Regions:
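Substrate-recognition "cap/lid" segment bordering the active-site pocket of phosphatases
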Residues: 98, 122, 127-184, 190-199
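An amphipathic alpha-helix signature
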Residues: 30, 34, 56-57, 61, ...
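Short acidic-hydrophobic, aromatic-tinged amphipathic segments that line or gate anion-handling sites
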Residues: 151, 223-228
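Non-catalytic pre-domain segments flanking phosphatase-related domains
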Residues: 1-16, 65-70, 182, 236-261
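Acidic, Mg2+-coordinating phosphoryl-transfer loop and its flanking beta/alpha structural elements
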Residues: 185-223
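Short, acidic loop-to-helix structural element flanking the phosphoryl-transfer center
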Residues: 15, 91-123
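Active-site neighborhood of HAD-like aspartate-dependent phosphohydrolases
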Residues: 2-52, 58-65
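Membrane-embedded alpha-helical bundles of multi-pass transporters/translocases
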Residues: 13, 64, 85-86, 209
Length: 261
């Protein structure tokens, strides 16, 4: 198993979360999942559940359970609901572009990382693959990501199992292998951190999610940033020696955890 056919691993694998990290899509993402759940549950109203960091199958399953669907029926109903959610979201691509936004610094950081040899940027997200592609495409970001080697909610409903899937795909489809210190998960929730920790890789958390920086401030991520607007700080964290870079000026804006925590 070799990287780029040269018998050595590429320098960095950056696994990007989508919602709250790269972009915010407005209400369309939630409404698409709700439309799928309503289709199979036959209800006009569904319980309003927190979604941050969860996979699409997990969210729909929780919606259906909250609507009174029997747990034994989830295996047959969740795929039907997901199919409807995909259909709905595909029709709202332009709407997401109008109502949503790309978070500060994201485009510039993607450009800078793409310009560096040996840096790969797949997605690692709770979205099913089709919906992830629709969401990044709504903002013209799809060209930055190696979508076939990403890991998605339809690969496994448990987010903690997604990093190994991405690593396996990089090896099988691109011939590239990575050591844990070469891999970063970038996300905006505690579930992104748990996902990284389960695989023994590094995690950069940003405060651009629905609940802001307070939601991640106290978490033991390898690095914390309010947002990605400081490109130099983000590059220092992601590409620095041993993967730890140098702490940015400005306190929590680019705070790096020490190896001891």
């Amino acid at each position: 198993m070799t990287a780029q056919g040269q018998g050595r691993a590429a320098r960095r694998l950056i696994l990007w979360d989508v919602d709250g990290t790269l972009v915010s899509c407005g209400p369309a993402g939630r409404e698409a999942l709700e439309s799928g759940a309503r289709l199979v549950a036959g209800l006009a109203a569904l319980p309003h559940l927190p979604m941050g960091g969860k996979t699409d199958p997990q969210i729909i399953g929780e919606m259906l359970l909250g609507a009174g669907v029997a747990p034994a029926d989830l295996g047959s109903l969740v795929p039907v609901a997901l199919a409807e959610a995909k259909r709905a979201l595909a029709g709202w691509r332009e709407r997401m572009g109008r109502e949503g936004k790309v978070h500060p610094g994201v485009r510039r950081l993607l450009d800078e990382l793409a310009a560096r040899g040996g840096v790969r940027q797949p997605l690692l997200t709770g979205n099913v693959a089709v919906n992830a592609a629709i969401k990044v495409g709504a903002f013209g970001l799809e060209g930055y990501f190696d979508l076939p080697v990403g890991a998605y909610g339809d690969d496994n409903a448990q987010r903690e199992l997604l990093v190994p899937i991405a690593l396996d795909r990089m090896r099988e489809l691109r011939g590239e292998t990575y050591q844990p210190e070469q891999v970063w998960v970038i996300g905006d929730t505690a579930r992104d951190l748990s996902c990284a920790r389960a695989a023994g890789v590094r995690c950069l958390l940003v405060g651009t999610g629905r609940d802001g920086f307070d939601a991640v401030r106290g978490l033991e991520a390898d690095a914390l940033m309010e947002n990605l607007a400081d490109t130099g700080a983000a590059l220092g964290i992601l590409l620095g020696r041993s993967g730890r870079g140098a702490p940015a000026a400005g306190g929590a804006r680019g705070r790096l955890r020490s190896p001891g925590g």
